[in-house]
Amino acid sequence: MSAEMSSSTRTIYVELLDEGTTVARPTQGEALAGDVYRLLPTPEYDPDDEHWEFPPGSVVRVVKEIRDGEEVLVARELVTTNR
């Protein structure tokens, strides 16, 4: 990953659907503007295995949340899909 790419990406948590409990998958998000990011797939992403609330390529608005004592960014609102 280039230095340019790494400076514009952050870890974003995306809720997984159909898991039977609340689960969030960490992935990378490309910063677009303020609290808006484009979600990138994880290397092992399989849409038949995991159902992300917002699939890779989606442009989402994130919010800061405290999880396990740490502040993280969580995808909460779809801005647009870009598949």
Segments and roles (model prediction):
Residues V23, E65-V79:
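Short, Lys/Arg- and Gly-enriched loop/turn segments at beta-strand edges
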Residues D49-E53:
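Short, surface-exposed secondary-structure edge patches
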Residues G57-V60:
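Loop/turn positions that initiate beta-strands
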